[in-house]
Amino acid sequence: MATMMHFGQFPSNIPLRAATCCTKVHSTLVTKEMMASSVKPAESSSVARPIIYSSAATDGYEKAQRAFEASFREKYSGKLEAMKYGKMVKKGGLTYVKRAGPQAIAKGIEMDAAIEKFNTAFNAGELENVTLEGDITAGISVARGESVWLRSVFWSRSLKKQARKKTPKLVAKSDFDDLFNKVLKVASLGNIPVEIVGKKANKILRCGYRRVNTSTIPYFHLPHHNSNYICRELHPQRVRWLVPLLVRHRKIRDQFSDSMIARGWSGLILPKYIASTCGRRYDEVIVRGRLYGRVEDARTKLPAGDVGRTMHYSSGEERFFAGWKEGFEKLVPAQKEHICKIVQDNKFCGKLAASIVQIAFPCHKMACDVCRNKFNEMTPEAYSELIDKHIDQRMNEINEAIVRFPGLKQVVSNFRSKHIASTNIKDNLEVAKLTQGHKANQMMQLARINSILIKGNTATPSEISDASGLLLEITRWFNNHLSVIDKGSLRAFRNKRSSKALVNPSLLCDNQRDKNGNFIWGERGYHSKRFFASHFDEVTPGDGYKEYIIRKGPQGQRKLAIGNLIVSFDLEKTRQALKGEEVEKLPLSNSCVSKRNGNYVYTSCCVTLDDGTPLYSNIKNPTKRHLVVGTTGDPKIVDLPATDTDKMYIAKEGYCYLNIFLAMLINVNENEAKAFTKMVRDIIIPMLGTWPTMQDLATACFMMTAFFPETSSAELPRILVDHTNQTMHVIDSFGSLTTGYHVLKAGTAAQLIDFASTELEGEMKWYRVGGHGLPVKEKMISALITSIFRPKKLVYLIEEDPYVLIMAMCSPRLIISLFNNGALELAAKHWISRDKNVSAIFAMLMDLSTEMSKAELLIEQHRMINECAKRVHDTQNYLDEVGPHQQEVRTFLALISDELEADKELHKTGFANFSERFHSLTEKNVCGRVRRGMARFKLVRQILLCHLCVQAQTAFNIRFAPEKVRRYRCQIRHIAQLVRWKDEGTPKWRPEVCYKPDHPIHELHQARYARQSHAHHVQLPKGPRILYECCLGDSFAH
């Protein structure tokens, strides 16, 4: 069978020689047969063992290599095939391989298999008898140099790169100066302003052209046109290129001189020959103003002091009318009923506008901030009073204006304040007293309605609408609660104590317990010394127990059961020791509960029994050197840190809350114990002080849990609630002999933190922990008495807590003392610019002190105080919070203001009244405290005088000549008069009086003064000398 062979596209009939199989291959490679045979040595030889080991290692490496290659092929065979049969793609100037898909991979594998099959057949000689005949096309001559393309079956056309056509950018070619010149030419013809915007917002230059008479002059918009007065208004580098361009289109057609430059010329660019007084180096002058008669250029940097002296030539009238037009057009009425015609001139309109402004906002300068801001601080009543007063003072001028502008009559009548419609002010004030201080929503709404009713006709329509809405809400509330009067009562309140004890993981951890099961403090015990060192007292066993049995507080006392540590073996006495001393048992009341959003917070309430009665505390027996924690179930007794084995400690009065932080220390990690104790000692204790409120203590506990989160689950010691004295007692290991207190349910630090919430409603968060300090009233009076002799403290009270000065109304002597030392006048001046109502109160006290100085009887002075207290109390109702004691002062004023009326009612009904005797005793007490303060003040003054005289005399005798002694004596006499407020005569000095005869260096001083017998010495007054000698002892002789 004849076959034809094709060379590319050209067939050929040339017979091919039969293929022969090559049986012998000549190669230069070394085959396995040509290699020397390996002889395996005997295992017993010295060479065998290394060979065996190396062979095994080589086989292991080859095996691992084959396994790796097999794993690699299995894992990456798909990616390799995709890359192998992928296409070369050129895109964006890059050439990369585009991976083939599954169909392309299958097609490629099939093609490879066909090629491999052909090559195998060809190498095996299976195609020896195959003859391919080809055809040669006539006319083709290879000799001509023509190329022959042999295209195989696997040929494919290559991708052609498509050229992208680039669109050339059209760039306009123009000269910038020419463009800007044309813009400025247009601006000069129509007086159009031009803005040149820089790279930043504050780099904008505003310029343009202005008509001055018949001339066209360029100008710059300067910063002082916007009331921004700076040293240099235009930098020369910024406008150096712009000034010549602006000057090109300047046309001066008038004769100008330097004297003609006045207001309105600010910013104009004038030639140097016109602004002849400008002594600057510029050819063109940018007018800013005049300084010392010379025209100043805006590019010149002036000193800071000369900026205010410069008379700037900006046109204020233009800015005024620009603002007037803008504001007038914004407030034009929405409805237009007619077509407006201009009938009057601008002068008429200006007078009308000025009249309306002065009636509504009387002032001296509209540009003055003080004149404008005083209306912001005024109340509506004060504003109405000011308008009435101003209209009365300027009634003649206003009547003349009304004749010219009849419409002003309606304006004046509307601005006139109207009389208060409510004539029953007494009832309104009584409502204000009843609603004062209540936080209930309904009471606050009633107070708001009452304040609107007091205003009467002066109330605005919005206030009347608010009052109607509040009245509707109160009516709905009363309608909803009329049938459920008992809702919210404590009849159904139950807060039983949990029967299960709280689990504290820190006390149950085996790693923190010794072989006896006791808690191991570790490093916590070492760092707890910071508590015991400064805020705990050491208890002496035995007779020392009696000293700590009574735990005193200013408002009450409690007995500890520390005496029961001495146990008697008499059964009867022991049974007697188990009886406590019971206080008055108070029933369940609103003081026992705390609420949030109208719901009970049970952990912040007192514990009750099943029937709703409160759980009263029984006797708490003492233990020795223990910390007792746990409020539910049986208490947990933890040994105190073993700092000293035989010592017992008790917290100082006012610091019993430290037992809470000591209990929290149990849950602190040992590595954080140092930080915990230092934070309590350095931050918490100084912040809380003695006898803090429960809210402050809970806030401090929250701070500690924020830094040490594990303390939130710490168990607390038992806390007893004394509602009579408003106190909470933290029970320590010495227990409590006093019984009958309520028990607080909070058992962990997290539960105690609820008292820190401002949303918590209840009285217990204001209770003192550990007792109550001095009453707030007594603290304020004590601070007031001590401030009379301490000017810095007095100034601090006036600035920070001015209500303390109102407490002077408890005694006529205090009011007169504050008036004499100028405290009341200083307070009135200080507060007149901050709160006029506070200043008015001090003015009332000044008038009261003047009236009381004329009264001879104490009862008459107290009557004046009672009458003044009513006025002060009424004024205080409209004050804002300006101090921490406003509520305390308000209660005090309400008490003394109602005292006089209550005494009258008692006298009418025939009851005896001891208020006069009470006032007499109180006045003696206050006068005594004031006299003691004055005595201390005089004592210090005399001591300082003695010290001054001794030092002055010693320095004078050593340094100055004898002839100047007379002048020195006069100076000492004047100093004594100024300091002691009386003439002591000519002072003399006697060494034998001022020095002790028995002093060791007395003879030395005698010899010294004998040598200086010509000198005159100062004799100290007898009282101060003896007092100083007693205070300083032997140092006085030195």
From Swiss-Prot:
EC class: hydrolase
Any single Pfam family the record assigns to this protein: Peptidase_C6
GO cellular component, one term: host cell plasmodesma
Active site positions, chain numbering: H224 (for p1 proteinase activity), E233 (for p1 proteinase activity), S266 (for p1 proteinase activity), C656 (for helper component proteinase activity), H729 (for helper component proteinase activity)
InterPro entries with a match to the protein in the record: HC-pro, HC_PRO_CPD_dom, HC_PRO_CPD_sf, Pept_S30_P1_potyvir, Potyvirid-P3
Domain Peptidase C6: 648-770
Motif Involved in interaction with stylet and aphid transmission, residue range(s) on this chain: 365-368
Keywords, in A-Z order: Host cell junction, Host-virus interaction, Hydrolase, Inhibition of host innate immune response by virus, Protease, Serine protease, Suppressor of RNA silencing, Transport, Viral immunoevasion, Viral movement protein
Single GO biological process annotation from the record: transport of virus in host, cell to cell
EC number: 3.4.21.-, 3.4.22.45
Domain Peptidase S30: 170-313
MF terms in GO: cysteine-type endopeptidase activity; serine-type peptidase activity
Motif interval(s): Involved in virions binding and aphid transmission: 622-624
Post-translational events: Potyviral RNA is expressed as two polyproteins which undergo post-translational proteolytic processing. Genome polyprotein is processed by NIa-pro, P1 and HC-pro proteinases resulting in the production of at least ten individual proteins. P3N-PIPO is cleaved by P1 and HC-pro proteinases resulting in the production of three individual proteins. The P1 proteinase and the HC-pro cleave only their respective C-termini autocatalytically.
Residue numbers marked as site, Cleavage: Y313, S314, G770, G771
Family assignment from sequence similarity: Belongs to the potyviridae P3N-PIPO polyprotein family.
Domain remark text: The N-terminus of helper component proteinase is involved in interaction with stylets. The central part is involved in interaction with virions and the C-terminus is involved in cell-to cell movement of the virus.
Protein name: P3N-PIPO polyprotein
Source organism: Beet mosaic virus (BtMV)
